Amino acid sequence: MKQRRTLYLVLAGLLTLSLLATTVGCQQETAEPTEPPTEEPSTEEPTEEPEEGNLSLAGSTTVQPLAQSLADAYMAQNPDVGIDVGGGGSSTGVTSAGEDTVDIGMASRNIKDSEFEEFPDLQVHTIAFDGIAIVTHPDIQLEGLTIEQVQSIFAGEITNFSEVGGPDAEIFVVSREEGSGTRGAFEELVMEHGGEEKLITADANLQSSNGAVRTVVAETENTIAYLSFGFLDGSVNPAPINGVEAEVANVANDTYPIYRPLNMVTNGPPNELAQAFLDFIMSAEGQAIVAEDYIPVQ
């Protein structure tokens, strides 16, 4: 009797365990799977790491003030970057870039074939266009000049303003020095106009920068010179060329005939920081700075 009771208890226990196992299994099969908690997507724009390091630029005195304005804006956004902008002229800029003495050279003209032959890895980055105005002392009022007349004046063939509709006064020519990008562009666009290759008169008063040219013309009677649009102000008189006023808008619409590219030059692909600076120059913000005095390329 005792053995039978013990058997009943064992069977009852086994039945209870079986029912529990079945219940747990069903719960596991029918339970809704739970997903790991997810974070709300960020609405903030990813931020780029600020740049750091130093850049050196040298060359064209036309590009120099523009490059300085661009450098100031870039350094304001990247306080760990230092950019040194020097002058020296376009030829110096090209040579310095080719010899790797600067990160970026500056040239206010096209690069010469001879320069590409000497430095075959040069890469040219055009950042703007610039007009070249023909300016006179404030007392000299000219209704306009043709390119042919400008060519003859700077060649020393026309020597009196009365020959081009001005007052009876001897002309004193002011020019940039050899190696200047502004001079190189002027020689290409004006002195070689029409298939002729005339030389600038040896009597010209040579100056080493656009700023110096402007000062001499503003302060010296009966002078005439060529000057970057970026240096035009009320101190000198720009003459219309071929009937077109010397204005940025007229370069942009291709009616003003004397203009040239403003270039930055690297020896091969630019380094990382130089590329970042060039990218900034070509951005909407950089080109807005260009547009203050020059013609943007974007």
Residue ranges and their predicted role:
Residues Q27-Q298:
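Exported/periplasmic ABC-transporter solute-binding proteins
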Residues A21-G25:
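C-terminal motif of bacterial Sec signal peptides marking the signal peptidase cleavage site
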Residues K2-L11:
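Bacterial N-terminal signal peptides that target proteins for export
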Residues L11-L19:
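Hydrophobic helical h-region of N-terminal Sec-dependent signal peptides
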